[in-house]
């Protein structure tokens, strides 16, 4: 932690800017094993790309069996003694801890061997670094270790003559970024074989096309988008690999939502076979019909194409099996691993407070009496039930902000129905929107968590902190509320912290709730 704080202060100092700019890769280690229960990266060996703000520490878990005999050069006693003398540490030479820490399987030695061996370091410097245009400026990103090993796995499959398969990486693990890195990597891979590649990223929803376009352009790729059958048919038959005149790397993002089951959208005739087409197929867990779907016809049209399916939840049933349609798994990265690496937050189901549970039960009974024997969705959307539920949500959320000392946390309320979402939003605007509590009531709040520091026990600070944690803004996301651009803007405002709450209705199953 001390070293991390030190590097953060240095990199935020304008005088260190030149050193930050020339730094490509950093490794931090306290030579301890990872503690997967830690919320923050506190112990272990981590790698990061430089940042003018705070470097993002990444875990590294070696997946390949390394030949230490070939990679590591034996250390002579003279060299060891010279280093110890130079640091005035000869006394530790016979120390058991020093002897143990020389072993190649210690955390620091492991990450150094994994990342700094000649071949790996060359790969990282050439393909694993990217400048990303974020909302807060230009950031330098480094490839996550599952993306690195997935890229190497793709290379092995291609070397073995296998041209299709599935990458099973959990939701939120950076599958679009993986596709970006492999545009660069596979371009060089095929050019070494005198082959010109042409890259496609195929999605089946317009919002996914927009998201992919944003992800690719922010990383510097030129993006060509296709959203119609005729445009895709023309593009796939064209001999032109890129559409820009500067020679920059390019990818074509295709939304097949309107024509994915059209058997004639891709035709074998007039097909240029001199181009190596590489398809990244997003969300291949969806139920594509293997007999009449777009993807089946795509397979028939270009047998030589490379098809890489991306999914976080593959289909394993008898009717639709992802492996049957798209090939065997190229690489896997599961939900639990992503949680341990800090890329995915752990889902926690908590019981609601007893007093509110009783209040909600009473409100539900009252709503049932008022509504009579009707659809339960109408009961759950009745103000008699919705209002106490909203009170509990807001109160519990504001307490969580205080307990976590983070007023930037946002909340998404996934409602039982569109009617319930509308009612919640209407009541929120009536009771909470832009209505900060008075100074006196906030200072006297009995269950408001107090900080331990003496300097922070004044009534003014408590009032200020209480007001910062207040929920005062929200948006309603429904298909018939606002236009597409407005809904998109509301979601973006929520992501950057301009909105506290989103009230949404998403008819998803419990299993797909994390994707909502």
Where is each model-derived feature located?
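ATP-dependent helicase/translocase motor core
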Residues: 1-198, 207, 211-222, 247, ...
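Structural recognition of the conserved hydrophobic beta-strand(s) that form the central parallel beta-sheet
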Residues: 28-29, 252-255, 280, 306-311, ...
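Interdomain helical connector at the RecA1-RecA2 junction of SF1/SF2 helicase-like NTPases
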Residues: 101, 320-408, 424-426, 430
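Short basic/glycine-enriched coil/helix segment immediately N-terminal to the Walker B
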Residues: 159-163, 191-192, 245-248, 263-278, ...
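Conserved helicase ATPase motor motifs in RecA-like P-loop NTPase domains
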Residues: 170-171, 283-287, 301-318, 342
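Inter-Walker segment of RecA-like/P-loop motor cores
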Residues: 217-264
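Conserved C-terminal RecA-like helicase domain
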Residues: 247-250, 377-504
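SF2 helicase catalytic motif II
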Residues: 270-306
């Amino acid at each position: 932690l001390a070293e991390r704080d030190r590097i953060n202060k240095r990199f935020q100092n304008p005088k260190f800017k030149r050193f930050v700019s020339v730094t490509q890769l950093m490794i931090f280690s306290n030579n301890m094993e990872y503690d997967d229960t830690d919320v923050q990266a506190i112990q272990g060996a981590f790698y990061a790309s430089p940042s003018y703000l705070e470097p993002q520490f990444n875990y590294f878990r070696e997946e390949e069996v390394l030949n230490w005999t070939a990679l590591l050069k034996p250390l002579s006693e003279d060299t060891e003694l010279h280093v110890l003398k130079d640091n005035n540490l000869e006394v530790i030479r016979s120390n058991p801890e020093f002897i143990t820490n020389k072993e190649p399987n210690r955390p620091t030695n492991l990450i150094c061997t994994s990342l700094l061996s000649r071949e790996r370091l060359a790969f990282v410097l050439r393909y694993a670094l990217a400048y990303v245009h974020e909302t807060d400026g230009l950031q330098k990103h480094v490839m996550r270790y599952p993306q690195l090993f997935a890229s190497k796995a793709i290379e092995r499959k291609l070397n073995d003559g296998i041209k299709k398969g599935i990458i099973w990486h959990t939701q939120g693990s950076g599958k679009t970024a993986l596709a970006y890195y492999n545009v660069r990597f596979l371009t060089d891979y095929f050019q070494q074989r005198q082959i010109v590649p042409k890259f496609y990223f195929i999605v089946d929803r317009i919002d996914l096309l927009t998201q992919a376009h944003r992800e690719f352009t922010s990383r510097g790729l030129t993006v060509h988008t296709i959203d119609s059958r005729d445009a895709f048919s023309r593009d796939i038959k064209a001999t032109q690999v890129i559409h820009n005149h500067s020679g920059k790397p390019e990818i074509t993002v295709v939304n097949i939502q309107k024509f994915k089951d059209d058997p004639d959208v891709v035709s074998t005739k007039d097909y240029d076979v001199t181009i190596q087409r590489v398809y990244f197929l997003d969300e291949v867990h969806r139920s594509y019909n293997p007999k009449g779907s777009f993807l089946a016809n795509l397979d028939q049209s270009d047998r030589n194409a490379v098809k890489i399916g991306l999914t976080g939840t593959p289909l394993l049933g008898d009717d639709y099996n992802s492996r049957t349609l798209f090939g065997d798994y190229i690489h896997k990265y599961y939900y639990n691993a992503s949680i341990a690496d800090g890329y995915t937050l752990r889902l926690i189901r908590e019981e609601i407070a007893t007093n509110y549970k009783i209040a909600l039960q009473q409100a539900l009974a009252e709503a049932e009496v008022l509504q009579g024997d009707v659809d339960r969705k109408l009961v759950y959307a009745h103000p008699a039930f919705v209002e106490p539920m909203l009170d509990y949500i807001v109160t519990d959320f504001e307490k969580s902000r205080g307990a976590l000392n983070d007023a930037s946390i946002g909340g998404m309320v996934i409602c039982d129905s569109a009617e319930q979402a509308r009612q919640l939003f209407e009541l929120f605007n009536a009771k909470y929107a832009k209505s900060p509590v008075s100074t006196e009531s906030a200072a006297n709040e009995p269950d408001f968590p107090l900080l331990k520091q003496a300097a922070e026990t004044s009534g003014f600070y408590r009032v200020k902190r209480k007001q910062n944690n207040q929920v005062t803004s929200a948006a309603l996301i429904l298909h018939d509320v606002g236009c597409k651009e407005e809904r998109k803007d509301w979601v973006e405002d929520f992501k950057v912290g301009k909105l506290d709450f989103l009230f949404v209705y998403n008819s998803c199953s419990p299993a797909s709730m994390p994707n909502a």
